[in-house]
């Protein structure tokens, strides 16, 4: 055996060790951020969620401002699902990640709840004041806590439970304010968004549990859940007859309907991927907290960009929800926040030599 053969043979046998030591990739819009510090991963993923979903919220409200669009929320959802599926397949080909890791039966369940979440959410926009829809979605923490207990057997402290109760109070206050000032108050919108909220909470827990159990990627999750979901929605819009009225409407206003839907879907697809990555890296509850903060900003922008009735009671209700969000954030970062509070109090009282337990500032 030649020296070159020996060297080649040794290299082949040593290669798997180096591969095993490689860090599992974490992709953000095509860039691998796995080797970045944990806190920077959190900042980058959270910032991407803010940018993509604020744009998504703007386009969603804009498309439902089109005259006659109100009854076609499910058709819009079908377009979104088809685009998501196509993008997911393209990404799987690009990253050579075509092997399915998660069983079909689980994807069937995830697809059902994904359809319920996005379909009911889109449909509710036609019947609700948009900030009301968003404030309901801000309170997904409530069913996420319940789902975490029932699906994953998690236990939560009294702070998380208190945050959920405050969110419930905020929802009630916002609904009463909406009923007071909205000229076209429609209870169907509330039923739809509550259904979407419950389904969305179930999705987060099922996705987190099975992505960790089977090692499935976010691209795979998007491809199969939205691909199967497209079949479900197509069957629904055909059986309900919605598609036969929607096609002439979409063709008549093709630049706005299909154009807005394309932009909405692209922003949504990128956002879904980032959220799934956030869930895989930091868990469902932390991801919900980040997306909830983003929705609070969306509400402010909605009042600024689109004319709608306003009452100060919206501010009170939103403040209660924001308090609940920060209470939840405190629960997830209790040690580091307690240390910062001790330092602040000590400095305010004139003490400079204060010992506090050191901990990673990015506890999630």
From Swiss-Prot:
A GO molecular function held by the record: 3'-phosphoadenosine 5'-phosphosulfate transmembrane transporter activity
Give the record's GO CC terms: endoplasmic reticulum membrane; Golgi apparatus; Golgi cis cisterna membrane; Golgi medial cisterna membrane; Golgi membrane
Q: What's a Pfam family in this record?
A: UAA
The regions listed as transmembrane in this protein's record are 39-59, 74-94, 106-126, 131-151, 157-177, 187-206, 231-251, 257-277, 281-301, 310-330
Q: Which GO terms describe its biological process?
A: 3'-phosphoadenosine 5'-phosphosulfate transport; transmembrane transport
**Compartment list:** Golgi apparatus membrane
Q: Which UniProt keywords apply?
A: Golgi apparatus, Membrane, Transmembrane, Transmembrane helix, Transport
Q: Could you confirm whether the keyword Transport appears in this record?
A: yes
InterPro entries assigned: SCL35B1-4/HUT1 (IPR013657)
Topology of this chain in the membrane: Multi-pass membrane protein
The family classification in the record reads: Belongs to the nucleotide-sugar transporter family. SLC35B subfamily.
What function is annotated for this protein?
A: Mediates the transport of adenosine 3'-phospho 5'-phosphosulfate (PAPS), from cytosol into Golgi. PAPS is a universal sulfuryl donor for sulfation events that take place in the Golgi.
Q: What is this protein called?
A: Adenosine 3'-phospho 5'-phosphosulfate transporter 2
Which species is listed as the source? Caenorhabditis elegans
Q: Which gene encodes it?
A: pst-2
